[in-house]
Amino acid sequence: KASSQKYTAPLVDTPRSVTVIPQQVIKDTNALSLQDALRTVPGITFGAGEGGNPQGDRPFIRGFDAQGDTYLDGVRDTGAQTREIFAIESVEVAKGPNSAIGGRGAAGGTINLVSKRAHLGNSLDGAWTWGSDQTQRYTFDGNYQFSDTVAGRLNLMTHESNVAGRDKVNYDRWGIAPSLAFGLGTPTRVNLDYYHLESDDLPDSGIPYTIPTGGSGARTSADPSKPYAGGDHDNFYGLTGRDFRKSRVDIATFAIEHDLTDSLTIKNTLRHGNSMQDYILTQPDDSKGNVNNGSVWRRANTRVGNTATTTNQTDLFGEFYLGGLKNSFSTGIELSREESERSSYNVDTNTKGSSPTTCTPSLIGANSDYNCTSLSNPNPDDPWNGAISRNYAGTDTKSNTRALYVFDTLELSPEWLLNMGLRYDHFDTQYRTYDASGATVVNSKGVASKSRDTSEFVTGQLGLVWKPAENGSIYVSYATSATPPGALLGEGMEGNPLGNTTDRTGNLLSSDMEPEETTNYEIGTKWDLLDQRLSLAAALFRTEKENARVQVDTTSYENVGETRVQGIELSASGKLTDKWQVFAGYTYMQARQIDGGPLGKA
């Protein structure tokens, strides 16, 4: 069964594809980060910092960007970051549109991290890792029962490593996650959890791409852009004296749960989280074709980002009978406020060439103030001493969410189950733009550069399950999701697609953007075999997105077009014997753009 009470049936009877990565698989694969763990799940790929994205986790589920669809114990975890795994018990990946469970977004699915929490009993676990490239990692996981109803748990981690096959790059981080539980084994239970993670890295943007001599417009299948490092893929084109990436995450959670009766429970979860990301990293840029003459421009990508989130969820769940039919239900309300501030640095990267970004062999080194380096033999320790200053030009985005939801699994008979879910969201987001000094930008009519959007949407899920045997099921399901403008608070590839237009008198006009709408159709089967030691699943799916939002120029977005992803997924997981464990999967996907919109902009 999934950890969230919103799943009202065991996974074998849940009409959607759900993959659970248990603690044993995390240990067996030596996963050190969320990305490591998710690489064991079919249907997930990863992006990087393309298109101005912040550094951090950027998973794609079934081809759809899921950067903003990560949850911690069922609560949205906003803010770009690279997530650790030391305080995580398991990872749950639900595939297909999942807004009914998670709220806005979730076009391809959701990722839920289940925390290590205090429990009854005493346990002690520790691990250390020494490896190549100066890798050192130490973890501690201790649980202690103070009394019949009170327990505490502490998780610690420190990690230092360089990167195999890359010069100079290093990643250093440490974290602590204490947990206290009261009332264990009683009708009223309280959990207090805290999570802190800090990192200090020398980041890596990889190697440059070659551009044909005729420029990017001259690219063909025979002469494409392709990565090229001058013969040595260990080459690092950054600067050890300039580049850095620092991040910090703090999350505090207070949860209280009370059994009203043997079949009815109420739970409230209050959480506040802050995440910070601060970096300057070198992108080996070839926008001017510098690689063709053996040189590379050290472009600087920068970001200063802070995200704060406060969320309160109240859930009522349990079982009841109506007309002689059993209902397993969950209903609740969610209130949240999220704020994201984003700015950057000014970095002097002028090469002193024919243009500020042009490099030639004669400009490599001191003649360009070390903003040009050699393609085949870069020196990361160049004595770069250019100017760096804060640039407060950026945005402040604030969002408020109010949501109501209800889920029910209706047992029509021992062989037939009907799974239903419905959610209403009121999502209000607004942003303000600042200039380099930190002052609010105003237009020619003196109106502040800001905008807002209010979206209301209803999403749902419906599935019919047939159980030919107690240990198996065959299902058909339908699910929807909605992604309103500003859903990522400017923390992802979309930025802020809100209007900044005014009427003739300069009064601000609200955005008229509509939410993107995604629909999933799925048919599948699940079986628990070998006394529930082995779980098998197969599914055919089709996911369609309408109202796709596309950036048509530097400041404008439009709802145009339709896309479709369809495919098949197979999975197997379990413990066959005391010594043999299997965790396998396969996904085949076919993606198409069905309609590019009236102007073909999609």
Question: What residues fall within each predicted segment?
Answer:
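Face-selective signature of the C-terminal outer-membrane beta-barrel domain
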Residues: 252-274, 301-433
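Acidic, small-polar-rich N-terminal luminal/periplasmic segments of exported/outer-membrane proteins
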Residues: 1-121, 523
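Structural signature of Gram-negative outer-membrane beta-barrels, strongest in the C-terminal barrel
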Residues: 181-185, 307, 326-328, 334-338, ...
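Transmembrane beta-strands of outer-membrane beta-barrel proteins
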Residues: 124-126, 152-154, 190-192, 266-270, ...
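Transmembrane beta-strands of outer-membrane beta-barrel pores
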Residues: 128-134, 158-162, 196-200, 272-278, ...
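Gram-negative outer-membrane beta-barrel transporters
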Residues: 533-535, 539-544, 559-602
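Outer-membrane beta-barrel translocator/receptor signature
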Residues: 87-89, 100-176, 184-188, 250, ...
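Acidic/polar loop-and-plug regions of large Gram-negative outer-membrane beta-barrel proteins
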Residues: 159-164, 171, 176-259, 274-307, ...
